[in-house]
């Protein structure tokens, strides 16, 4: 815990954040049910405090199966390759969410870069047997979006036509986050 408290002063808000970070870290290690069952901050002397945290880790979980539902545009093997998680891997919800939506080469970006800005991927735990979790990735692809208008403002030194010429996204094109 000491690495989370760099300041010399105990701050309640940072302590709460540190406890959340601790549980997140447990989740990344496969302990999705980890909870803090007790914690206390006890003054040691006038300058220091002792922090006691009792954690119930619960079961460590692994991925048993990953099934994709609703993917009509891209085959399952392409989505699995982008997800980079497979049977037997430690169940890491943080990594899964990053691989689905936030990483540069995430599954969601495959859809976004091809105009599917309204797409959504909902990971659902469908079955838990012992230490194994079955996942169902529910994809709602939605309609493709096109760029209807590009507004340019604040250009004092460069003519608008020069800026428009350099744009990769033009009106009528499919939306692509990558091309922005």
Region roles according to the model:
Residues 1-180:
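Interaction-mediating elements
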């Amino acid at each position: 815990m000491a690495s989370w408290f760099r300041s010399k002063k105990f701050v309640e808000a940072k302590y709460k954040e540190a406890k959340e970070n601790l549980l997140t870290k447990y989740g990344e290690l496969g302990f999705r049910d980890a909870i803090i069952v007790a914690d206390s901050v006890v003054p040691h002397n006038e300058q220091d405090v002792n922090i006691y945290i009792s954690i119930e880790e619960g079961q460590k979980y692994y991925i048993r199966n990953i099934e994709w539902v609703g993917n009509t545009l891209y085959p399952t093997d392409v989505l699995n390759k982008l997800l980079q998680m497979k049977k037997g891997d430690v169940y890491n919800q943080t990594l899964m969410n990053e691989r689905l939506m936030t990483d540069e080469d995430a599954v969601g970006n495959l859809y976004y870069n091809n105009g599917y800005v309204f797409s959504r991927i909902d990971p659902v735990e469908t079955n838990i047997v012992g230490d194994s979790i079955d996942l169902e990735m529910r994809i709602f692809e939605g309609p493709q979006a096109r760029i209807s208008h590009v507004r340019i403002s604040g250009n004092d030194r460069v003519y608008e036509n020069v800026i428009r010429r350099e744009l990769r996204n033009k009106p009528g094109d499919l939306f692509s986050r990558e091309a922005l």
